[in-house]
């Protein structure tokens, strides 16, 4: 059966997350239902596999999944057909590509990239409601960057993972954690860019929630290092809400899509 990789974008707001769940809407089940109209295997209950299982309310601009289909589709026609059957769900197939049988969206990936959007202003968000986390107070960019520097590299991230995390080890290597600032009407937007081979459950939201406390002046930057060294979930700052989080890309040794960056 030919295997296809799918590059996927979605608004996570109406979904209970990526993973299929009984009687709850998910991105996975939405795409599988669309595939079921095109492929007998999916009509009979076949499943797709994704690079990352995003939580409820988390968005994606560069999720990757793979599917084994009965028919050897032209990739462009496959993406067009899927987008037709996905309407009106806020899910889009940006590209499809024929890949080798040993390609696996999750296990072949060597990096994952996330963006978190944090907006500091008092007036409510309108256009970006549900697409960024908003706080009403000013934030200190330099302090947040100083706190973030303690988290780069290979560490035991027990403090920054959910108590329900199923990963075998809390040790991860955080390859990138940068923060940019931009002016918006009557406020500032802070964009956190994170990159690693893989992440623990709630790791990104735990990191951003902690750094927000640093930016607000509630934590000194050095307390981030102390929290990390504690290897204790109770030492973490608050876990920020999901709506500002985006899975923006997945890296592979051989990029499956011609315009992959």
From Swiss-Prot:
InterPro entries: PsdUridine_synth_cat_dom_sf, PsdUridine_synth_TruA, PsdUridine_synth_TruA_a/b_dom, PsdUridine_synth_TruA_C, TruA/RsuA/RluB/E/F_N. Its EC number is 5.4.99.12. It catalyses: uridine(38/39/40) in tRNA = pseudouridine(38/39/40) in tRNA. Pfam families: PseudoU_synth_1. It comes from the Bacteria. It is an enzyme of class 5 (isomerase). GO terms for molecular function: RNA binding; tRNA pseudouridine(38-40) synthase activity. Substrate binds at residue 114. Signal peptide: none annotated. Keywords: Isomerase, tRNA processing. PANTHER family: PSEUDOURIDYLATE SYNTHASE, TRNA PSEUDOURIDINE SYNTHASE-LIKE 1. Formation of pseudouridine at positions 38, 39 and 40 in the anticodon stem and loop of transfer RNAs. Homodimer. HAMAP family: TruA (MF_00171). Belongs to the tRNA pseudouridine synthase TruA family. This is tRNA pseudouridine synthase A. It comes from Paracoccus denitrificans (strain Pd 1222). The gene is truA.
């Amino acid at each position: 059966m030919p295997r296809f990789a799918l590059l996927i974008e979605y608004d996570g707001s109406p979904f209970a997350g990526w993973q299929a769940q009984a009687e709850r809407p998910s991105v996975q089940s939405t795409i599988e239902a669309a595939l079921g109209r095109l492929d007998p295997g999916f009509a009979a209950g076949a499943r797709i596999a994704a690079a990352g299982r995003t939580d409820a309310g988390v968005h994606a601009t560069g999720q990757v999944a793979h599917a084994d289909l009965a028919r050897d589709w032209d990739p462009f026609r496959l993406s067009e057909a899927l987008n037709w059957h996905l309407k009106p769900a806020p899910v889009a197939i940006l590209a499809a590509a024929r890949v080798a049988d040993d390609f696996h969206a999750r296990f072949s990936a060597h990096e994952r990239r996330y963006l978190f959007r944090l907006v500091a202003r008092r007036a409510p968000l309108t256009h970006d409601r549900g697409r960024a986390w908003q706080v009403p107070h000013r934030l200190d960019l330099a302090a947040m960057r100083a706190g973030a520097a303690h988290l780069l590299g290979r560490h035991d991230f027990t403090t920054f993972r959910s108590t329900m995390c199923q990963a075998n080890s809390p040790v991860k290597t955080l390859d990138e954690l940068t923060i940019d600032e931009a002016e918006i009407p009557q406020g500032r937007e802070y964009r956190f860019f994170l990159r690693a081979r893989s992440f623990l459950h709630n790791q990104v939201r735990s990191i951003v929630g902690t750094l927000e406390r640093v930016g607000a002046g509630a934590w000194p930057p050095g307390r981030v290092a102390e929290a990390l060294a504690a290897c204790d979930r109770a030492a973490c700052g608050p876990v920020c809400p999901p709506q500002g989080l985006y899975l923006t890309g997945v890296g592979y040794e051989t990029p499956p899509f011609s315009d992959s960056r």
